[in-house]
Amino acid sequence: ASFDEAPPGNSKAGEKIFKTKCAQCHTVDKGAGHKQGPNLNGLFGRQSGTTPGYSYSAANKNRAVIWEEKTLYDYLLNPKKYIPGTKMVFPGLKKPQDRADLIAYLKEATA
């Protein structure tokens, strides 16, 4: 399903997904350091591979995608297909509702 067909996201459900599937490598807390993956604070509207102080793969820098709801929706389906060569080992979220929920949470938590 494309982003245009995505269900509305539930940020509470998205927070649970973040805690179980993302938080071991990422944080959303402003001013917190990077973990294995970059801090996601300020994610929306930022270009991939540009968070200060994090060592990105050339793939993430060269892809130069602007993170927004649609790009995250596509990326989170299959990160390695969307950015071949990414360091992110997460296989993705296959269910449209899970992606919509996670994005709703990230929109609130990273602002």
UniProtKB/Swiss-Prot annotation:
Entry-linked SUPFAM superfamilies: Cytochrome c (SSF46626)
Protein name as annotated: Cytochrome c
InterPro entries the UniProt entry points to: Cyt_c-like_dom, Cyt_c-like_dom_sf, Cyt_c_1A/1B
Main location (coarse class): mitochondrion
Keyword Membrane: no
Similarity comment text for this entry: Belongs to the cytochrome c family.
Post-translational modification: Binds 1 heme c group covalently per subunit.
CC annotations in GO: mitochondrial intermembrane space
Record key words, sorted: Acetylation, Electron transport, Heme, Iron, Metal-binding, Methylation, Mitochondrion, Respiratory chain, Transport
Keyword 4Fe-4S part of the UniProt annotation: no
Cited Gene3D superfamilies: Cytochrome c-like domain (1.10.760.10)
Coiled-coil intervals, chain numbering: none
Binding sites annotated in the UniProt record for heme c: 22, 25-26, 88
Its job: Electron carrier protein. The oxidized form of the cytochrome c heme group can accept an electron from the heme group of the cytochrome c1 subunit of cytochrome reductase. Cytochrome c then transfers this electron to the cytochrome oxidase complex, the final protein carrier in the mitochondrial electron-transport chain.
Signal peptide per UniProt: none
